[in-house]
Amino acid sequence: MLNIKEIHELIKAIDESTIDEFVYENEGVSLKLKKHEAGTVQVMQQAPAAPVQAQAPQAVQPQAQQAAAPAQEAPKQDENLHKITSPMVGTFYASSSPEAGPYVTAGSKVNENTVVCIVEAMKLFNEIEAEVKGEIVEVLVENGQLVEYGQPLFLVKAE
């Protein structure tokens, strides 16, 4: 199954190409990318009902909307800081359930495969991984907050 990063790369490649439509099917998962008239890519994905984790549909939004991130985002200027961004529009959850503790907090050590949060989109819960080894420096969003595509969620000091 494709992960969020691979889907994002496909969207970018299709958006920059002359291809109008792309369809991917594998193991019961169907992904359809189709350009609208304005040249933006629309993503439609149908996931199987059995798995708990599934990729949610996502729409590519203009880069200008990324600037709409909250003013609380004041990243420390350090070349080793990596931003973990939201791969989709949805609701940010710091833990797997209301009773559970957060996946990570400031000071938590993470590796590339560490789940740092969940972003819910259309009743599908998508686990977001750190994708870098290091230490969480700052959590930039609140639990239950609506997040935009590309919005920074965490700052990680990369090792």
Curated annotation (Swiss-Prot):
Residues where N6-biotinyllysine is found: K123
GO biological process: fatty acid biosynthetic process
Domain of life: Bacteria
Residue intervals of the Biotinyl-binding domain: 81-157
Biased composition (Low complexity): 53-74
Functional pathway: Lipid metabolism; fatty acid biosynthesis
TM region(s), chain numbering: none
UniProt-recorded Gene Ontology molecular function terms: acetyl-CoA carboxylase activity
UniProt-annotated stretches for the region Disordered: 53-77
Cleaved signal peptide residues: none
A family per Pfam: Biotin_lipoyl
One CC-aspect GO term: acetyl-CoA carboxylase complex
Stored SUPFAM superfamilies: Single hybrid motif
Family annotation (Gene3D superfamilies): 2.40.50.100
Assigned keywords, A-Z: Biotin, Fatty acid biosynthesis, Fatty acid metabolism, Lipid biosynthesis, Lipid metabolism
Subunit text: Homodimer.
Task performed by this protein: This protein is a component of the acetyl coenzyme A carboxylase complex; first, biotin carboxylase catalyzes the carboxylation of the carrier protein and then the transcarboxylase transfers the carboxyl group to form malonyl-CoA. Binds biotin.
Protein name: Biotin carboxyl carrier protein of acetyl-CoA carboxylase
Source organism (scientific name): Bacillus subtilis (strain 168)
